[in-house]
């Protein structure tokens, strides 16, 4: 099992980071998982829709999640994840490795978005039709390829080591399974094994039990 590594400026943080997001998993959960993996204490502020409506006009970017850390305010979930990845040794060791990680993360975001596009449809009949397409076409398209990646990368998604792509995979698989009300990894044994291993990582295991 990989051990979390805290490096760089996190060793010298004077104030506790603050993550602001809604009281749900969504795009905030990959960040929470990375902070848990790094054993970084932070304020997990779950903002209400009413509070957010009053707050967002005064921000540099009206987007959540938002991470306040080391006197800086970070927006955009994947930018925040990349920032944390560099601090926690969850990034690539070369430009090419970084690019491979980015490609996988982009694919995971596309996967999540395609499932979410069905889940949030207001019309029930249309939603069921779209769900059938997601189950028959979208799941195999992404899961088959991700299964091959794990087989070819020493049990990880990319570059043969734990990266933030794996943490995002864990978060999104949980979210996608929830939206589909289905255990989606049963036909992909390597992904299923990887998923279970990620859930047992130090920090992450205890976070998932909260």
Predicted regions and their residues:
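Extended, well-ordered alpha-helical scaffold segments
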Residues: 133-134, 138, 186-200
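GST superfamily/GST-like fold recognition
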Residues: 101, 157-184, 192
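Short, mixed-charge aromatic SLiMs
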Residues: 104-109, 192-205
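GST-like domain detector, emphasizing the conserved glutathione-binding G-site
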Residues: 11-141, 152, 157, 161
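Structural helix-adjacent loops and short alpha-helical linkers that scaffold large soluble proteins
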Residues: 92-95, 181-188
């Amino acid at each position: 099992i990989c051990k979390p590594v805290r490096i760089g400026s996190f060793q010298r943080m004077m104030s506790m980071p603050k993550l602001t997001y809604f009281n749900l998993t969504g795009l905030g959960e990959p960040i929470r998982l990375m902070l848990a993996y790094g054993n970084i204490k932070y304020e997990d502020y779950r903002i209400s829709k009413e509070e957010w409506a009053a707050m967002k006009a005064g921000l540099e970017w009206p987007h959540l999640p938002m991470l306040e850390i080391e006197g800086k305010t970070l927006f955009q979930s994947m930018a925040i994840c990349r920032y944390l990845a560099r601090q926690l040794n969850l990034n690539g060791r070369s430009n090419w490795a970084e690019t491979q990680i980015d490609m996988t993360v982009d694919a995971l975001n596309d996967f999540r978005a395609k499932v979410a596009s069905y889940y949030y449809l207001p019309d029930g009949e249309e939603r069921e039709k779209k769900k059938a397409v997601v189950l028959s076409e979208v799941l195999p398209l992404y899961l088959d390829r991700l299964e091959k990646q794990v087989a070819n990368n020493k049990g990880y998604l990319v570059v043969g080591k734990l990266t933030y792509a794996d943490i995002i995979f864990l978060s999104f698989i949980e979210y996608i399974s929830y939206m589909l009300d289905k255990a989606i990894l049963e036909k992909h044994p390597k992904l299923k094994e990887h998923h279970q291993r990620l859930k047992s990582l130090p920090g992450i295991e205890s976070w998932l039990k909260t």
